[in-house]
């Protein structure tokens, strides 16, 4: 959702994490190249390597939310003639669930957050952007047009979250009216998820250990 605090959550939650192990990708409107592929292609391209943390600011869920509110945008996607209507969204839910299941089976832990800001607070944040010179650049007049479709978006979000919250990739709906609370809840969930991975330091082989002992002796013999 616009003005839900996605950028600030990423900034504050990841403070202190070694940036060498993190990548952040923001998804906007698909490029002409991306429109020449299926809707999950650009997501696959942006996935992190094993051992790294990947953060998606927006994602493939735009394809079952924004496009459901604006079905006319589908015309740019060069889709087959069928299916359209409700069947299309059901098929995309299936595709997303299968895609995320595939990632989970291959070692990618998926944690999904929906930052749920109220309509009142969204309005306050839009006005605050307009009032502050350092934030006005973040305001987009088109966001007000989308705000007029609030009920349609809420319906699309509800359908998508219900259909795609799975044991391997559950949704976490986070209240987003108070940023400190939003960020604290995200941190708690991420800490629990990382601890559940039961990570450990890389094992040192016996051969490496012997080489390390020899290196230690050489260091200790140095004047």
Positions of PLM-derived features:
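Glycine-rich phosphate-binding loop of ATP-dependent small-molecule kinases
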Residues: 1-223
């Amino acid at each position: 959702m616009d003005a839900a605090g996605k950028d600030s959550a990423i900034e504050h939650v990841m403070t202190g994490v070694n940036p060498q192990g993190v990548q952040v990708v923001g998804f906007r409107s698909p490029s002409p190249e991306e429109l020449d592929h299926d809707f999950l292609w650009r997501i696959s391209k942006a996935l992190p390597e094993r051992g790294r943390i990947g953060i998606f600011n927006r994602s493939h869920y735009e394809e079952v939310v924004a496009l459901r509110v604006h079905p006319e945008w589908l015309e740019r996607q060069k889709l087959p003639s069928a299916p359209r209507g409700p069947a299309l969204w059901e098929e995309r839910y299936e595709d997303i669930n299968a895609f995320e299941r595939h990632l989970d089976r291959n070692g990618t832990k998926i944690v999904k957050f929906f930052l749920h800001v109220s309509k009142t607070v969204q309005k306050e944040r839009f006005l605050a952007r307009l009032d502050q010179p350092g934030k006005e650049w973040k305001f987009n007049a088109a966001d007000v047009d989308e705000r007029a479709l609030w009920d349609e978006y809420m319906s699309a979000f509800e359908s998508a979250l219900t259909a795609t919250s799975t044991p391997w990739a559950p949704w976490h709906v986070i209240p987003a009216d108070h940023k400190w609370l939003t960020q604290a809840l995200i941190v708690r969930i991420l800490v629990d998820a990382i601890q559940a991975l039961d990570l450990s330091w890389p094992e040192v082989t016996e051969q490496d250990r012997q080489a390390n002992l020899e290196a230690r002796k050489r260091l200790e013999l140095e004047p």
